[in-house]
Regions:
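Post-transcriptional modification and biogenesis factors for structured RNAs
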Residues: 1-155
Length: 155
C-alpha cells in the first residue's frame, strides 16, 4: 500500500457513526485512520455495518492501545491537535503530506497532557461561544479537506 496522504487519529472515539463517517473520508482521500482504545463501540462486522461502514474493507486503518504507540510507529510525523482550547485556526496551519491530525473523543476531547505536548500545533475551527463543540466527523472532514486543498488536490 502506498504512503497515506495523512494520518487521522481518533483518541478514544465514542460514537461509531462518527468513526464511520471519518473512515469514509479517509478512504476518499487516501488517509490512514488510527483508533486509540478504549473505543465506545465494538469493531465487529455487525456494528460496523450498523454504522454504515460497508466500505471498511477499502480503509487503511489500525487500532492501538495508546497515543504513545502511534508516536512510536510514526516518530517523525508532525502532529496537529484539534481542540477548542487552541488559539490558532486551522487555516493558519501549513499542512504537509503525512501529517498526523489528532482528534479527541466526542465526550472528553483530548487529554490536557497531549494538548500541552503539542501546544505549538494545537488548532481549532472558529465558532461562537454559545456552541460547546462541533461534531467530531464534521470537524475531521473540514480539517482533512483543508489539508487536501493546501496540497492542491489528491494528485
Amino acid at each position: 500500500m502506498s504512503e497515506p496522504l495523512l494520518h487521522v487519529v481518533l483518541y478514544q472515539p465514542d460514537i461509531p457513526q462518527n468513526t464511520g463517517n471519518i473512515g469514509r473520508t479517509c478512504v476518499a482521500v487516501g488517509a490512514k485512520l488510527w483508533l486509540i482504545r478504549p473505543l465506545g463501540f465494538r469493531l465487529d462486522e455487525k456494528h460496523l455495518r450498523r454504522a454504515g461502514m460497508d466500505y471498511w474493507q477499502h480503509l487503511d486503518w489500525e487500532a492501538v492501545d495508546s497515543w504513545s504507540e502511534v508516536r512510536e510507529r510514526l516518530p517523525d510525523r508532525r502532529v496537529w491537535c484539534l481542540t477548542k482550547f487552541a488559539s490558532r485556526m486551522v487555516w493558519d496551519a501549513e499542512f504537509q503530506r503525512g501529517d498526523i491530525l489528532l482528534f479527541g473523543s466526542e465526550t472528553r476531547g483530548l487529554p490536557e497532557s497531549i494538548r500541552d505536548e503539542n501546544s505549538a500545533n494545537n488548532l481549532k475551527l472558529p465558532m461562537h461561544d454559545v456552541v460547546r463543540s462541533l461534531n467530531l466527523a464534521s470537524t475531521a472532514n473540514t480539517v482533512v479537506y483543508e489539508a487536501v486543498r493546501q496540497f492542491g488536490g489528491l494528485t
